[in-house]
From Swiss-Prot:
The gene is murB. Belongs to the MurB family. GO terms for biological process: cell division; cell wall organization; peptidoglycan biosynthetic process; regulation of cell shape. One of its GO terms (cellular component) is cytosol. Pfam families: FAD_binding_4, MurB_C. The active site is at residues 177, 227, 297. It comes from Clostridium botulinum (strain Hall / ATCC 3502 / NCTC 13319 / Type A). The lineage of its organism: Bacteria, Bacillati, Bacillota, Clostridia, Eubacteriales. This is UDP-N-acetylenolpyruvoylglucosamine reductase.
Amino acid sequence: MNQYKNFIMQFEDIVGNNNVLIDEPMKKHTSFKVGGPADLLITPTTLEQVKDSIILCRNNSIPYYIIGNGSNLLVRDGGIRGVVIKFLKLGDIKVEGDRVIAQSGAPLTNICNEALKSNLGGLEFACGIPGSVGGAVTMNAGAYNGEISQVIESAKVIDKDGNVFLLNKEQLDLGYRMSAIQKYHYIVLEVTFKLHNSEYDTIKNRIMDLNRRRTEKQPLEYPSAGSTFKRPEGHFAAKLIEDTGLKGESIGGAQVSEKHSGFIINKGGATAGDILNLIEFVQNKVMEKFEVDLHTEVRIIGEENN
């Protein structure tokens, strides 16, 4: 039974009637296309609504989870007890000189395109990363020798008590797939990037080259959450998996991609359970062969199916 239905009217007062969904299947909101229902899913349209929603959750001991476009997220088949706050409608982007300021829900691709229009370079590496900027900053996303830490200036965040404040680059403490945001459970509201002036064609050609390489090497035609595992120190996850003989290995509808072993894909009809079982199988086999512990890069939330 959905124990949070009593709060529907209060959330509707904050975000509007059309922005509250009940027992919403999370497979509609993740790039893996799997996941059970969330008790409530709300989509705020202003940063003030985010703050008010978090305070309502805190004051009533309601668990809440923040998502962007769900591109680095695996929701278990039992779904989510509590409230999912989706930043889909918080995607404003503005350019001020050599700075690009974006709300947390803005897709990285949109930010890159705005930078391109203003002849600002530095974000080319991020143009093919499918996530939104809030998640990208939280995990210090990166690709092709670039990462968020190289271009970020500051981030406006909110804590669990509803306090809003600004963190500079040093305070964000960005490392490999980690940040102070993760450590202290902050939520990113807005991000400022400091870029550099460049030629339009130079930026455009770099973006096109990286996207071509992605298309050639990554299984973009299947649902996935991007790279499934973090890079272990001194190794590459994909090479360890391939050298263990697991390329193409499958459980149910989940498969280790034959195109890129670092990706676990939904080949068709997968459940979250299939994907989780395959992740565990890969981890165990790599540990047996190489004594290397693979840690997931994908964020895993939700309840097991009863």
